[in-house]
A protein has these predicted regions:
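Long, charged low-complexity segments
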Residues: 145-152, 384-387, 391
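Amphipathic alpha-helical interface segments
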Residues: 1-141, 165-381, 396-503
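Substrate-binding/catalytic groove segments of enzymes
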Residues: 151-162, 391-401
Length: 503
């Protein structure tokens, strides 16, 4: 089996898994609605745990499936980043990353298994294996930065390059996913055993409990209808794919300029002063950092929108929409800010600080952009809803608090929200065009400064060569020193020229 066939079989297998757990989650939700907590507490509690565990499972699998199906490099990176974020949220829900944390789903499960008198040797062994796997998994965990970038973004292009652009091999992420799904499979089996045994102990059967897979939260096919309407014309899908290619290339180009600026300062021996510098190089460094961050936000929006249109089931579509609601709100918080405090530290506020006083046209453009951007963050309630969509929290009273998350999600109209995301993408296109114009304006000043730097570098190199010729007697050492000076001079000159020509 070649690589393409293997990936294809993996996609089919993952889709089957998602379809299966899609049914499991919806059935568990219906059972939760039908069962009387007072009459069958253990069965109710195990079912609630099952609902939460299966929700975490399907949430991670949906991102993994999107990563496997994606052809675009950035979309693939985005979805693997979401896999890491989903795993992080899942581990926090079932186990926690804190030491000596008692309020965990694992501890709760163990307690109700013991209290129900159904703890058998096989389950004890499974819990021991599960504990060992979780201890090993969390001890080796290093996904916090990627999780934070996925859900909250970051202001450092350096970190984005390290945590996401650096994803060139899917192998480690596939291994991470495999280890996590092994944990979730064991947990699912324990929850299902507890649920079934509790029914038996109460002389109940499956026939006494609702087993259908429709749900008032995701049961009216509104996402399928929305996707069908959006896909009637190919223009959305085609435009998204084309924009992923275009802005993906621009993002990598911007990161390349950003890294060249680093190299210039490393060779000049003043790397630490780069971020604090107010000269044209320092400003260009900061501006390319902001430019890369805006492009990164654009690519995230395009990636999750593309995944929504590719959804196969109603719950899969609903959870993909959950992600684009989270991403949309995160992007607006990051770039514009919903509150005065957020606006004061937003990317847009920083961008405005680079507008040259001598460019009135740019100031006029910025004033127009201000009104567009402020309009985009008028809905203050969205941040409260985002918080409910983002975190699945464990508590003893609500061990499977999936219904609240889905009920919040159900308040959104899919078509309306899809078009809002498209409006945001169009708004980011305007921000990017503004940045293009700003970089051109700044580049004129940078080119002049480059020429000054080039003259200084040539003068310094010439003086060093004269000193070596005069004072170094050893021919081999002299040759090595002269070669080193020439090499560094050429490197710096090439980088300085590259910084002003790469956009």
């Amino acid at each position: 089996m070649d690589k393409e066939e293997y990936i294809s079989s993996l996609i089919d297998s993952m889709q089957t898994t998602i379809d299966t757990f899609n049914k499991e989650v919806l059935i568990a939700i219906n059972r939760d609605e039908a069962m009387l907590k007072e009459k069958a507490f253990s069965a109710y509690a195990f079912n609630a745990c099952l609902m939460g565990v299966d929700f975490v499972y399907i949430n991670v699998c949906i991102s993994a499936l999107a990563a496997l199906k994606a052809d675009n490099e950035h979309a693939k990176r985005y979805h693997w980043k979401n896999v890491v974020a989903g795993i992080s949220e899942g581990i926090k829900y079932i186990y926690t990353f804190k030491e000596n944390e008692k309020k965990t789903l694992i501890r709760y499960l163990t307690t109700i298994l013991n209290d129900s008198g159904i703890m058998i040797p096989e389950i004890t062994k499974s819990l021991t294996v599960l504990q060992d796997l979780l201890d090993k998994f969390t001890a080796n965990w290093d996904g916090k930065d990627m999780r934070d970038i996925a859900l909250h973004y970051d202001k450092s292009t350096e970190k984005l390059i390290k945590e996401t652009v650096g994803i060139t091999d899917e192998g480690p992420y596939a291994t991470l996913l495999s280890d996590f799904l092994l944990i979730m499979n064991i947990l699912h089996s324990i929850c299902m055993y507890g649920f079934l045994q509790s029914l038996i102990n109460r002389n109940l059967s499956f026939n006494d409990i609702l087993q259908n897979e429709t749900s008032r939260y995701v049961g009216n096919d509104k996402h399928k209808k929305a996707i069908h309407a959006l896909l009637k014309e190919d223009k959305f899908k085609i435009a998204i794919e084309e924009n992923l290619e275009e802005y993906g290339k621009r993002f990598l180009d911007s990161c390349s300029v950003f890294e060249k600026l680093h190299k210039v300062y490393e060779l000049l021996g003043c790397e630490g002063e780069l971020k604090l510098s107010n000269n044209h190089f320092g400003k260009l460094y900061k501006l390319h950092n902001l430019y890369s961050l805006v492009l990164y936000s654009m690519l995230d929006l395009l990636s999750i929108t593309d995944s929504y249109l590719s959804s196969k089931t109603e719950l899969e579509a609903a959870l993909n929409m959950r992600y684009f609601l989270i991403v949309k709100t995160s992007v607006l918080t990051h770039i514009v800010g919903y509150t005065e405090k957020e606006a004061s530290i937003s990317l847009w506020n920083e961008i405005k600080g680079f507008i040259p006083e001598s460019d009135p046209q740019l100031h006029d453009m910025a004033a127009t952009m201000d009104s567009y951007l402020r309009e985009s963050v008028k809905d203050q309630n969205i941040k409260r809803k985002r918080a409910k969509l983002l975190h699945l929290s464990f508590s003893k009273n609500k061990p499977g608090d999936v219904k609240e998350l889905l009920s919040v999600l159900d308040t959104f109209d899919p078509l309306s929200e899809f078009y809002k995301v498209l409006d945001l993408i169009k708004l980011l296109v305007k921000v990017i065009k503004f940045l293009d114009r700003l970089i051109v304006s700044m580049d004129k000043e940078v080119t002049i400064e480059n020429l000054k730097h080039l003259d200084k570098i040539r003068s310094m190199s010439s003086s060093l060569r004269d000193m070596i010729e005069c004072y170094v007697k050893d021919k081999v050492q002299k040759e090595e020193l002269l070669t080193s000076i020439n090499d560094n001079e050429f490197k710096i000159i090439d980088l300085l020229k590259g910084v002003s020509t790469d956009k």
